[in-house]
Amino acid sequence: MRVAISLRVEGRDWEDASQYVVEAERLGVDCVWSHESWGYDAVTPLAFVAARTSRIQLGTGIIQAGTRTPALVAMTAMSLASMSRGRFLLGLGVSGPQVIEGWHGIRFDRPVTRMRETIDIVRQATRGERASYKGRVYELPLPGGEGKALRSAAAPQPGIPIYLATLSPKSLEMTGEIADGWLGTSFMPEHARVFFDHLEAGAKRAGRSLAQLDLQVGGFVAFSDDVDRLIPPRKPGLAFTLGAMGSRQHNFYNDAFKRAGYEDVALEVQRLWLDGRRDDAASRVPDELVLKTNLLGTEAMVRQRIEAYRRAGVTTLRVEPAGESLGARLATLERLLALVRDTEKSVAVGAPRAAR
């Protein structure tokens, strides 16, 4: 099992953020993901850390499809793949109407079709082919004008891995069909089939197996002999996910928890959050949900969670280590890595792994 982290910037402390990645690379972390919502973009920070690292893979986790043309996504991917000497991973997601329409002023429509066509055009461009495409959302060149089918002036970069952050059944099937990896959220190993069944259906449609995808999920990591102390601070974040990451009509994260059997909780927390009762919303998040979506407690308890992810079929554990300082975060990360390696040693001598 591989380990991934996220590049997170507190305020404007870019030096601290980049040093975290440099040290994580030294410890053996496999990849780092840079995200975007309505703050910093996902791309620029990766260029910053690419110049300071040599081995760790660098991924956009995620670029919001629809905020950039497919050609610009391809140009960005080829630039980062070139400057990082092949370490770049292109992570894409559709975001949601509140961000796409509210922040970018772009209509949130046909998200699955838009994503599929974006990937088609990106792969066409990165292979060095002329951009000629006729889809339901995109058509290149644009008809009725003076545009020509262009070939990228950059050197071809075929085979850039594409990861999709998807949650709905239809988008999960598309991920299994056309992507190289999946960036999961709202995930609990005990309910992995809520996602994996759809990923597998898409993979089968493309004549391949789920084992050909890198499945990346995980959560917050914190060590303590008093696990009860670690639970309450995680509840506001889950309440935010259930209540604020979308509208009442469109919240893909909330829908995922409902499909996993937490419909009553998801609806109640969402209702309270949208009514402005955020503390009440957080208080309704059950301890069980916190423990299932994170890796908390003693080393033995965290190891059990690692094993649960492994048995479910997860190939890369994406984690956020606890710590108020750089040193504290790295200490947590180092303990986690040691447990992952110890777990992998046990697998090597015969411990079972779930079929994917």
Pin down the residues of each PLM region.
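Active-site-adjacent beta->alpha loops and helix N-cap segments on the catalytic face
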Residues: 40-47, 188-203, 327-331
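An alpha-helical appendage that flanks or caps ligand/catalytic pockets
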Residues: 109-153, 193-311, 345-356
